[in-house]
Swiss-Prot record:
Gene Ontology MF terms: ion channel regulator activity; toxin activity
Expression by tissue: Expressed by the venom duct.
This protein's name: Conotoxin PIVE
Sequence intervals crossing the membrane: none
PTM sites of type Lysine amide: 24
Annotated organism of origin: Conus purpurascens
Length: 24
């Protein structure tokens, strides 16, 4: 996975503090 979400949902900001809730 990517930052706890499926690879299909992986996005550059997923690991960024400003977008840490993206895809949660």
């Amino acid at each position: 996975d990517c930052c706890g979400v499926k690879l299909e949902m992986c996005h550059p900001c997923l690991c960024d503090n400003s977008c840490k809730n993206y895809g949660k």
